[in-house]
Design a protein with these regions (language model features):
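Catalytic palm subdomain of template-directed nucleic-acid polymerases
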Residues: 219
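Short clusters of hydrophobic/aromatic residues that line enzyme substrate/ligand-binding pockets
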Residues: 23-26, 38, 181-184
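Radical SAM [4Fe-4S] cluster-binding motif and immediate context
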Residues: 42-204, 214-216
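A short, charged helix-loop
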Residues: 29-48
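Glycine-rich beta-alpha loop elements in corrinoid/cobalamin-binding modules
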Residues: 1-34
Length: 221
């Protein structure tokens, strides 16, 4: 809209563009205050034509936006100003229902910390399971699980696994060295809690993916 209205690229916040071989980054864009202002592309019919085609389709939804953490080597918290905002549950449920009706193979939630809202995210998992039983879809659900995942978060993964929906359960540690974690402004769960999570996941046949970053400040010289 800005370009069509004749606005110069320099005056459009929140973009990066190439100007005569030099990359230009404009200032930060104003954050959307009310997520209800954003229409769902699924619910307004932008992707309805997909159901006419014999494609294997994945879909991405977002149930909340933002991250309360400010880990140095993660762009999520810094770019979203840390405050988490939630999409209306009716919208989220509508998108999950759309995914089921339209035979979406894998539903991906692009949240930064799925499971951080215990009761709300439990309701969302209920809806995903209910939708699969109703339509046979989605086949799988994937997301970025809450940092410092606890047993409550693992409970969500176990329910998904029991209904054949879980692809993997991811735990991000970045590093286990205390000095490195201090350098990158990050804290992890206690190692005993981490072991308990792994043991219980194994007991429930859940594949666990552990995310680390190699060569963080203070780790290698």
């Amino acid at each position: 809209n800005s370009i069509m209205s004749g606005k110069k690229l320099d005056d459009i916040p929140g973009i990066t563009y190439n100007k005569k071989g030099k990359w230009i980054q404009t200032g930060p864009s104003e954050r959307i205050t009310h997520l209800g202002e954003i229409q769902s592309p699924y619910l307004i019919g932008l992707f309805d034509d997909l159901k006419q085609e014999e494609y294997s389709v994945n879909a991405i939804i977002e149930t909340d936006r933002g991250c309360p953490y400010k880990c140095t080597f993660c762009d999520w918290g810094g770019t979203t100003f840390s405050k988490i905002k939630k999409f209306d549950l009716d919208r989220v449920f509508g998108e999950i229902e759309w995914a089921g009706k339209n035979k979406i193979e894998m539903l991906n939630s692009s949240n930064a910390n799925f499971g951080i809202f215990k009761e709300r995210d439990s309701l969302i998992v209920d809806k995903i399971i209910e939708t699969k039983h109703k339509y046979g879809y989605p086949k799988l659900f994937e997301t970025s699980w809450a940092k410092n995942s606890n047993q409550d978060v693992l409970d969500l993964a176990i329910r998904l696994e029991k209904n054949g929906l879980l692809r993997k359960f991811g735990i991000s540690v970045q590093s286990t060295e205390p000095e490195v974690l201090k350098n990158i402004k990050r804290s992890n769960m206690k190692i005993n809690d981490f072991d308990d999570i792994l043991d219980r996941a194994k007991q429930n046949n859940i594949s666990v993916m552990v995310e680390t970053i190699v060569g963080l400040p203070g780790e290698t010289f």
